[in-house]
Amino acid sequence: MGFKSNFLFSTSFVVFLFALMFPINGLYASSTLKGMQLGDSDAPVKIIEYRSLTCSHCADFSNDTFAEIKENYIDKGKVNFELRPFALNAIDLNAFKLLHCVDENDFFAMDKILFKDQKKWIVTNQSDKVLENSTNALKNYGALFGVSEEAFNSCMENENITDFILEQRIEGVEEYDISSTPTFIINGEIYAGNMSINEFDEIIEKEIN
C-alpha cells in the first residue's frame, strides 16, 4: 500500500509490543475476540484466512471471490471458513480494533464494507497524517454499526483487543510462517496469495473427494 516504513510492524516489534500487554481477561467485546467462523464446524474442509484490512489483494478476494465460496461451499456445509487478523501496519491495527468491537452479529457485515470501501477510509492525501485521518474515517464506519464516538475511542485504547490482534499475528508467523496476506490454510496446507475461484474449486473438491 506504500505506507511509510514507520507504520510497519516487524515481527520483532510486534512480539515486543505483545510482551508488554496484559493477559486477555475482562474482555471488552468477548464475543468477537476470536477467529470468526462461517459454516458447519464439522465441514470436511476447513479454511483459515489470515488477512489484512489494508491489503488490496485481500480486498480483491473479499469483493470478487468470497461470495462464490460462500454460496457453493459454506452454505452447503462443505466448508468451514475462519477469518483471522494479520495486522501489517498501524492503520490495520486500528481497523481490526474497530472490527472486533462491534456486535458479533455485525462482524461480517462490517468486514465486508471495510474491504468494499477500502480506498475510502484509507486516507493518504496528507502523508504525515495518514494514520490520524484514516482512524477518523474509521470512526464514521463505526457509527454505521452503532459505535458511538466514546465507544470508538475506548475501543482504540483497549489493551485486551490490541492483545488479541497482535497475538493472532504472532501465532500466524510461528505456526504457519506467514509473511504476507492473504494466506489461506486449507485443511492444514498453506497457500500464500490471492487465488481465483477456479483454484479454490480445484483444492476444495480434491479435499472433499
What kind of region is each of these model predictions?
Residues G2-I91, K139, A143, I165-E175, ...:
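Extracytoplasmic thiol/disulfide redox context detector
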Residues A87-S180, I185-E189, N194-N198, E205-I208:
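Cysteine-centric redox/oxidoreductase cores and disulfide-bonded domains
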